[in-house]
Structure formats: structure tokens, C-alpha cells
């Protein structure tokens, strides 16, 4: 998981999710696109 100050969609399959006040990017097809805003 990458921790970044600004998260953006890398590919069209990415989903932006808000959990516990943090913003995450998840992608089931490409798990290496996982990001968290930190």
C-alpha cells in the first residue's frame, strides 16, 4: 500500500473509498494500485 498526501485514480478500475476518515484507493484487478491518504 502506498501512503500519499494526495490520492488519485491511476486506472479506471480504481475505486475511491472512505473508511474511518481516511481516503483509500482500492483495485481488485491490480492490487499494487492500493493507496491511502496519510
From Swiss-Prot:
Keywords of the record: Ribonucleoprotein, Ribosomal protein
Cellular component terms per the entry's GO annotation: ribonucleoprotein complex; ribosome
Pfam families: Ribosomal_L36
Signal peptide extent: none
Entry's Gene Ontology molecular function annotations: structural constituent of ribosome
Any GO BP: translation
Stored InterPro entries: Ribosomal_bL36, Ribosomal_bL36_sp, Ribosomal_L36_bact
Family statement: Belongs to the bacterial ribosomal protein bL36 family.
Protein name: Large ribosomal subunit protein bL36
